[in-house]
C-alpha cells in the first residue's frame, strides 16, 4: 500500500453569521470567511471518495456550526476544528481559520483566528 501525505483545502468559504461580542453584531450579523486545510494519509493507489474526506461534508458541517451563537471568533473556530476532526480517522493535521470581515471598529477590515495541529 502506498500512503502519501495529502492536503484537502477549503478556501474562502463565505458565510453570513450572527456572531459578535456586542448585541448589535449578533442582531445585524456579518460576513465570515472560513479556510480549512485537512492533512490526510491516503492510499494513492486506490483513491475513492470513501478513502478521503468529502469536502461537501466539510462545507455542510461548517455552515451548521456557523449557525450557532458565538460571541468570539475563537469559539466558532474551536468548535469547527473539533467537529472537522470527527469526520475521518485519516485526518492527521488540521488547520482552521475563521476571519471576521467588516468589523465595526474604525479602520479595521478584518480579524482572524487560526487553530492548527
Feature map (PLM): residue ranges:
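N-terminal, polar/charged subdomain of small-to-medium soluble alpha/beta proteins
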Residues: 1-117
Amino acid at each position: 500500500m502506498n500512503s502519501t501525505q495529502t492536503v484537502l483545502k477549503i478556501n474562502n468559504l463565505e458565510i453570513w453569521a450572527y456572531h459578535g461580542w456586542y448585541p448589535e453584531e449578533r442582531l445585524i450579523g456579518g460576513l465570515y470567511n472560513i479556510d480549512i486545510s485537512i492533512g490526510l494519509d491516503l492510499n494513492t493507489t486506490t483513491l475513492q471518495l470513501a478513502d478521503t474526506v468529502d469536502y461537501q461534508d466539510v462545507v455542510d458541517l461548517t455552515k451548521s456550526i456557523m449557525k450557532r451563537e458565538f460571541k468570539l471568533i475563537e469559539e466558532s473556530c474551536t468548535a469547527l476544528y473539533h467537529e472537522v476532526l470527527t469526520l475521518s480517522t485519516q485526518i492527521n493535521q488540521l488547520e482552521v481559520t475563521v476571519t471576521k470581515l467588516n468589523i465595526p471598529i474604525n479602520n479595521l477590515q478584518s480579524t482572524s483566528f487560526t487553530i492548527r495541529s
